[in-house]
Amino acid sequence: MSAVSMLQGEMLARGGAVIARGASLATARNFSRTTVPMAKIRKERDTFGELEVPADKYYGAQTARSQMNFKIGGPEERMPIPVIHAFGILKKAAALVNTEFGLDKKLADAISQAADEVVDGKLDEHFPLVTWQTGSGTQSNMNVNEVISNRAIEILGGELGSKKPVHPNDHVNMSQSSNDTFPTAMHIAVGREVNSRLLPALKKLRTALHNKAEEFKDIIKIGRTHTQDAVPLTLGQEFSAYVTQLDNSIARVESTLPRLYQLAAGGTAVGTGLNTRKGFAEKVAATVSELTGLPFVTAPNKFEALAAHDALVEVHGALNTVAVSFMKIGNDIRFLGSGPRCGLGELSLPENEPGSSIMPGKVNPTQCEAITMVAAQVMGNQVAVSVGGSNGHFELNVFKPLIVRNVLQSTRLLADSAVSFTDHCVDGIVANKDNIAKIMRESLMLVTALNPHIGYDNAAKIAKTAHKNGTTLVQEAVKLGILTEEQFAQWVKPENMLGPK
């Protein structure tokens, strides 16, 4: 059965199901007279035989066959578009280089033009395949080859599906294998997304947190360890920790890029470079670098580049650490902003939308909730990427689509949530100075300043007695005869407790 016939059958089945769920008899009779228009088709062939494909699509038989064999997840599970666009970059680079090794320039120019349209997103609708296919990504590589081939044929005035004058394997896939093109596209896609989306977003959040650390540098508050009262610090010092977490996150991500920039192209089937020419790998990497503006190079060992994806596992390890930082920062700000009257209430967070369908006036820390949910998703993706990376069997890793899907999702979610958290939360945070001061004055841990003067045991006695009696530190210190009010006022000054003496 062709892909078109199957689609028509599913449409009819869905229509029948609607009738069965309660449509009137009149409606049912009316439906029975409705004719579903037949989509125009053309016939294409692969090594398994002939298949019908939609006439208005550039893909061919191998793509249609994959649609038939891998009905897993539907449109939501399609191969990530950044991978498709990365393939366009690679196919253009290969065509340009292959002109040095026998590819007719006229064909190369048509392939290059079609590949540009892939990169620009003009042909996105022609890439229907899902992530859950062969672990090498062969079907997606052929999807790209077929689309570029047919579009190039169209550019040259030929007949779609004829494979003349541009053949998907012989010309678009010249000097290539799915085993080296898919990992190359993986690296290009992730490299572009990290540089264009993630790093700018992290730097934006870092700047916003730094601005708040400066704004809050003179606000003294009580610290908390184990969620219990501790000694004072400034709110600026507290936020400076978040700034450093972002600094380190950016540095960690950037430190993974040298391995990510190594491309498998030129390794072909198992890493030996069979069916390529000397210099092809280096020239393709240099051309990809020129097209992307990123410092891609050929992988020094193609066997590793095909059989293992440690570089992407490493990238996601850095992303996972970013997620860990996001979870901590989001939770801290959420809890510091709890209230407004019965929580900590040290921070006021921007009020962006109503928070409850039943409690009037309630507003929630939704940006904190969103960024911590993103963090949880990325942590889950870390498991999937680790499992995928560990499944390189002999000369080929066969979890490639899963790996790149999760790395790209984590990259996108972290980037978008960082921007959202910055714009709709961090930039609008206000310190509640009066409440911060009130909480600090009530803390028993200010007694720590007395350790050098009266010793740990006496200081502990004052704190425990004050806690038991519900009194203040100074009241119990004087009552116990350990020191005077003047001594207490002289020695217990929060502003003198913010660093080494």
UniProtKB/Swiss-Prot annotation:
InterPro entries (UniProt xref): Fum_hydII, Fumarase/histidase_N, Fumarase_C_C, Fumarate_lyase_CS, Fumarate_lyase_fam, Fumarate_lyase_N, L-Aspartase-like
Main location: mitochondrion
Record's GO cellular component terms: mitochondrial matrix; mitochondrion
Pathway as given in its UniProt record: Carbohydrate metabolism; tricarboxylic acid cycle; (S)-malate from fumarate: step 1/1
GO molecular function, one term: fumarate hydratase activity
Catalytic-site annotation from UniProt: H226, S356
Binding site for substrate: 136-138, 167-170, 177-179, 225, 357, 362-364
Sites marked Important for catalytic activity: E369
GO biological process: fumarate metabolic process; malate metabolic process; tricarboxylic acid cycle
Alphabetic keyword roster: Cytoplasm, Lyase, Mitochondrion, Transit peptide, Tricarboxylic acid cycle
Subcellular localization(s) per the UniProt record: Mitochondrion matrix; Cytoplasm
Cited SUPFAM superfamilies: L-aspartase-like
PROSITE patterns: FUMARATE_LYASES
Record flagged with keyword Mitochondrion: yes
Reactions that this protein is recorded to catalyse: (S)-malate = fumarate + H2O
EC number: 4.2.1.2
Domain of life from the UniProt record: Eukaryota
PANTHER family to which the protein is assigned, alphabetical: ASPARTATEAMMONIA/ARGININOSUCCINATE/ADENYLOSUCCINATE LYASE, FUMARATE HYDRATASE, MITOCHONDRIAL
Classification via NCBIfam families: fumC_II (TIGR00979), PRK12273.1 (NF008909)
Entry's family note: Belongs to the class-II fumarase/aspartase family. Fumarase subfamily.
Known function: Catalyzes the reversible stereospecific interconversion of fumarate to L-malate. In mitochondrion, catalyzes the hydration of fumarate to L-malate in the tricarboxylic acid (TCA) cycle to facilitate a transition step in the production of energy in the form of NADH.
Assembly: Homotetramer.
HAMAP family, per database record: FumaraseC (MF_00743)
Note, other: There are 2 substrate-binding sites: the catalytic A site, and the non-catalytic B site that may play a role in the transfer of substrate or product between the active site and the solvent. Alternatively, the B site may bind allosteric effectors.
Protein name per UniProt: Probable fumarate hydratase, mitochondrial
